[in-house]
Amino acid sequence: MKKIIALLLCLGMFAAVCAGCGGPQITATGDEATNKSADAYKDTYDDLLNYLSAWGYINPLEKNKGVTYTEMRADLIGAKQGRRFNAQHTKNATIELYEFDLSKSNATADEVLSSVKADGSFQNLFGDKVDSFYLSSNGKYLMVYNDTSITDDTKDTDENYTKRQEVIDKFKEFKK
């Protein structure tokens, strides 16, 4: 009897996990989804999110919190705020976006920003060097783009590599 109950519980958990995997992605609609010109947006964190959403890279809508994005502990890198998004164009990528208050910088923020400016990386709390960091042209925003499908062997032929470069270019284009 115990084995049957355990089996039923396992099957129930498996069904619940599978049901959450293929759900539809809700994307931005209306004006925020149609205007792709960086000039149409203000220099704010929310407008950066709306701009990247208009290009179809992320989904920042509040009703999707926990599904398409997660609030991050931005203070760990000295940032004002940050979110990690599941990229909308591939299942293998996440895009983290952080805002720094340049008028009220702190030692942690200064260290992270200067390291990213120097070589696109910094050392995390464990002393490991972390790459794939990109600073906006105005130095106020930081993006971390991580795609597990891109390797040194596939980067010349991988469609995701090309898409990553497109996202980086659009990010840097915002409020030059």
Spans of features found by a protein language model:
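A short acidic-to-branched-hydrophobic micro-motif
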Residues: 87-108
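N-terminal "mature-domain start" segment
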Residues: 22-81, 153-176
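C-terminal motif of bacterial Sec signal peptides marking the signal peptidase cleavage site
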Residues: 16-20
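Short, Gly/Ser/Thr-enriched beta-strand-loop segments that form substrate-interacting elements
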Residues: 108-128
